[in-house]
């Protein structure tokens, strides 16, 4: 029997690992990097230097890196090994976090094979021995007020969760080739605004019904929660002009964009910019 979206989301957090959320903890949440094979379909390629600069910043400042799924594009590409070869510098940076026990990777719909594929896991083994990929993760509030639930967010859609093999086939053999000719995939929440809004509404509703703060990726639309809507989205690393993420520090959330800017003397530099006011966890309502 097909589960409804709310049950699929609850299942994502069954036996999910927990991390402490204290005033001293620092987490940075990225999602939807879609690292590819370095070809014309590799949407991550144009932002790889921004991503590298951001990772170096967060490593230097003591953040724990959490990736909320779709880190690698494994619908359009079959080989995780090829992706790691092309983006070796990126994975070397991630491995630094892993060696210091500061890296956690979730899977989304586009890299869902990490859930069970021994071959995909094997590609990670040299740099990330005994790595585990999770469907969800919970930041447990040490002040016993409001926990933060992290997952990819594809669970609201039947074709991106239960029927993902069908959707992967369509992306690989239909929408992928058409995208190279300028057509957008109408089944994608990242490219279809109507589907994007429906997904966001379902995720917000789930967060309210379950009395938690929910942070996902999937739609590629960055957003920070409000007092009445305890749902946030990290955005993605495939925007044309930058990458976005959410920083968590002092039990507060900050939506950040990394981009290339120009100084008056025409020197290019990487900038880190807040996209919205920082909001603290105690400012977000929960409904239970």
Over which residues does each language-model region extend?
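Acidic, histidine-bearing metal-coordination/catalytic regions of metal-dependent phosphoesterases
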Residues: 1-26
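A short C-terminal boundary segment appended to hydrolase-like catalytic domains
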Residues: 186-201, 205-213, 264-288
């Amino acid at each position: 029997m097909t589960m409804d979206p709310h049950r699929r989301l609850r299942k994502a957090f069954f036996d999910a690992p927990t991390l402490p959320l204290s005033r001293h903890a620092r987490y940075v949440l990225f999602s939807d990097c879609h690292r590819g094979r370095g070809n014309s379909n590799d949407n991550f390629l144009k932002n790889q230097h921004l991503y590298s600069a951001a990772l170096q910043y967060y490593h230097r400042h003591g953040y724990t890196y959490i990736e909320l799924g779709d880190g690698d594009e494994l619908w359009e590409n079959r080989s995780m090994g090829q992706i790691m070869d092309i983006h070796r510098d990126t994975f070397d940076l991630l491995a630094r976090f892993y060696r210091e026990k500061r890296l956690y990777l979730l899977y989304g719909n586009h890299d869902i094979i990490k859930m069970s594929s021994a071959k995909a896991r094997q590609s990670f083994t040299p740099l990330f021995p005994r790595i585990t990929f999770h469907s969800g993760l919970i930041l447990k509030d040490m002040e016993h007020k409001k926990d933060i639930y992290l997952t990819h967010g594809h669970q609201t859609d039947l074709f991106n969760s239960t029927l993902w093999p069908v959707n992967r086939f369509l992306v690989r053999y239909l929408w992928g080739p058409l995208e190279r000719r300028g057509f957008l995939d109408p089944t994608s929440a990242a490219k279809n605004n109507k589907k994007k809004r429906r997904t966001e509404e379902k995720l917000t509703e789930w967060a309210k019904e379950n009395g938690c703060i929910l942070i996902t990726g999937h739609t590629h639309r960055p957003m920070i929660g409000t007092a009445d809507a305890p749902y946030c989205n990290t955005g993605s690393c495939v925007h044309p002009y930058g990458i976005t993420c959410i920083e968590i520090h002092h039990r507060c959330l900050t939506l950040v964009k990394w981009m290339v800017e120009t100084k008056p003397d025409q020197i290019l530099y990487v900038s880190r910019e807040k996209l919205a006011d920082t909001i603290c966890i105690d400012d977000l309502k929960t409904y239970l």
